[in-house]
Amino acid sequence: MTVQTKTKGLAWQEKPLSDNERLKTESNFLRGTILDDLKDPLTGGFKGDNFQLIRFHGMYEQDDRDIRAERAEAKLEPLKFMLLRCRLPGGIIKPSQWIELDKFARENSHYRSIRLTNRQTFQFHGVPKAKLQTMHRLLHKLGLDSIATAADMNRNVLCTSNPIESELHRQAYEYAKKISEHLLPRTRGYLDVWVDGKKVQSSDDFLQEDEPILGKTYLPRKFKTAVVIPPLNDVDCYGNDLDFVAVSDGNGQLAGFNVLAGGGLSMEHGNTKTYPNISLELGFVPPEHALKAAEAVVTTQRDFGNRSDRKNARTRYTIQNMGLDNFRAEVERRMGMPFEPVRPFKFTGRGDRIGWVKGIDGNWHLTLFIESGRLVDEGGKQLLTGVLEIAKIHKGDFRITANQNLIVANVAEADKAKIEEFARTYGLIRNDVSKLRENAMSCVSFPTCPLAMAEAERVLPDFIGELDKIMAKHGTSDDYIVTRITGCPNGCGRAMLAEIGLVGKAVGRYNLHIGGDREGVRIPRLYKENITLPEILAELDDLIGKWAAERNIGEGFGDFAIRTGIVKPVLNAPVDFWDASKAVAIARA
């Protein structure tokens, strides 16, 4: 550390470091003994520190929880395998790459599926240990990798999937890529382990490594970054550690970015020292200083973030401990320049434009609704095959959206009909999807996530079906409510930016939060705790009935819940998220 312990926000330095800090220090720049574990046929998983280290390489060890008890009874270890998350800044991928990835998923993954995530990338679920090097070498051949998509690094960088404003989107996307590359770890550990298969042990090799931005112990905790183009807030910019809000010069060109910091949606049930929070405004920078600003925020979090208590290690807690003005001043000191005042911006919604839209460049873009992002051939649906068949003829690119959907982008007029034919044949275009369903989201949860407390992806379709009936009952079928289900309080389903958010508490039970907004700028308030899905539907039946009867013109469900006093707004999450009586508005910048 280069900072002094007396500096505001560093009280944690008086406490022992978390064991993860030891792990990173001793990992030989993330190599550990992973190669040794790959050769061990006695277990399907990784041992000791390697269980955590593989996360820096974009993987999590998981097992099939549906059969865990059955295997234990047979005296077998859990059916272990890995989740892999690809690094894909802005979610753009070529059809030629997709074809190879589809082949791997079918031949080598337990679930034979590809999962589109709300961080604009894809995941393989159920990859056995014996296939990991094969998988990483395939990614390398395709010009892809999975480094820094998990663990204490800057994760996959999001960028608004806006196919209409093509020039501004192109410029913003280029900065998303630049930010991603700039904040990557410099270690060759990923390549040595997964591509070259080398075992590096000597102290000389160890000393030659350098991590000028992340440091040899990397960041205190995960770090999430997004680039967003108003008025569409599809990337949920207020839920990230760092946000770059693109500002147009009025002629469709990029004038610069408003920089925000300190968003995050995870918490722990009953732990009032944890809370979700929205990101706060730091200021404006011209495009040429965007990387400087990104590095300054990251290194401030690197040096001031809590390395003793991982539950209070994200950037939002660092800002709370330092104070926003002190945090901003430290970032400006590291940038070597002050921020300019924030330029005006406004969000009007978050949903994707499902169906065909025409860009200003004359190309067409088809956004396909993919429920919970799951592409798989099962239950009479062939969604995975449908995307594969489109990939075989598509001359443009694919864009994974932050709403877990897929855009078939840059389609020529002459190719529209054939692509739509394939999409309809394989069920990728449906006429029975309500606006409510289009604006719903879930995390994966059971059976693969080890942190899951309740179902999410597997119950979302039926839950939304029941909610659709309630909407129809009250005459609101043409409207929507942003609804999200997450299986635990870690926040992967971004329920803490929903109008209706369900957070798993135990098997079959959830906490019900309401009062977020359609634009994604307000955290919902806890309304009912530890209740079942039927109980939640009964509560929502009553609330939606009131909304239908008493709402103002154009008023969303979340705004209605706040205006009518059903719940108090979360105004200052560190103070009032757990105690609504303390809800008092504060300055956000």
UniProtKB/Swiss-Prot annotation:
Binding site for [4Fe-4S] cluster: 443, 449, 488, 492
GO molecular function: 4 iron, 4 sulfur cluster binding; heme binding; metal ion binding; NADP binding; sulfite reductase (NADPH) activity
The keyword Magnesium is assigned to this record: no
Catalytic activity: hydrogen sulfide + 3 NADP(+) + 3 H2O = sulfite + 3 NADPH + 4 H(+)
Note accompanying the cofactor annotation: Binds 1 siroheme per subunit. Binds 1 [4Fe-4S] cluster per subunit.
SUPFAM superfamilies assigned: Nitrite and sulphite reductase 4Fe-4S domain-like, Nitrite/Sulfite reductase N-terminal domain-like
Cofactor field: siroheme; [4Fe-4S] cluster
Residues noted as binding siroheme in the record, renumbered to the chain: 492
Assembly information from the UniProt record: Alpha(8)-beta(8). The alpha component is a flavoprotein, the beta component is a hemoprotein.
PANTHER family (UniProt xref): SULFITE REDUCTASE [NADPH] SUBUNIT BETA, SULFITE REDUCTASE [NADPH] SUBUNIT BETA-RELATED
Similarity comment: family membership: Belongs to the nitrite and sulfite reductase 4Fe-4S domain family.
Protein name per the record: Sulfite reductase [NADPH] hemoprotein beta-component
